[in-house]
Design a protein with these regions (language model features):
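Short, low-complexity N-terminal intrinsically disordered segments enriched in polar/charged residues
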Residues: 1-34, 38
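A solvent-exposed, acidic/Ser-Thr-rich amphipathic alpha-helical stretch
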Residues: 7, 29-89
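Short, mixed charged/polar active-site loops
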Residues: 49-50, 105-107
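Generic short beta-strand segments
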Residues: 92-98
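Short beta-strand edge/turn micro-motifs at domain boundaries
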Residues: 107-135
Length: 135
């Protein structure tokens, strides 16, 4: 028997995605940071590791409100899988940039790994991507 129901994890992931979109559009990352436990770990391959929701919030706010990250407008998910037995979500997330009006969508893929903690929040996130693709 699984520790969590797939639907519970999926709802948490949906909420996480909505909070990320809101953060990108408003530059307020409060709701996104609230998707994590107080003692969560965030491993971002380019920037390093962050421990605790407050540190994650401080980092994401500073990073996403500064160019070039401030030009990210959305994070559409192209695919994901959920392991409800262990609480893992693995997804390909596109880092979509501002529309330049030339008919092309500028975006680069990111692999996001989330570990569910229960109660609608995650205790771990890891993002893997090549930052040179965004230059």
């Amino acid at each position: 028997m699984s520790r969590w129901e797939r639907l519970e994890i999926e709802h948490a992931f949906d909420h996480y995605q909505a909070a990320a979109l809101k953060g990108a559009q408003t530059k307020d990352w409060t709701d996104w940071a609230a998707c994590f436990t107080e003692d969560a770990t965030y491993f971002e391959h380019h920037y390093g590791r962050f421990w605790g929701r407050d540190n994650i919030y401080t980092w994401i706010t500073a990073t996403m409100n500064k160019w070039p990250a401030s030009e990210m407008t959305a994070f559409p998910v192209t695919w994901y899988t959920i392991d409800e037995d262990k609480g893992w979500v693995i997804a390909e997330v596109m880092n979509r940039m501002t529309d330049l009006g030339d008919g092309y969508i500028y975006q680069e893929p990111n692999i996001t790994i989330l570990h569910y903690a229960g109660n609608g929040v995650f205790k771990y996130e890891e993002d893997a991507y090549n930052p040179h693709n965004m230059e």
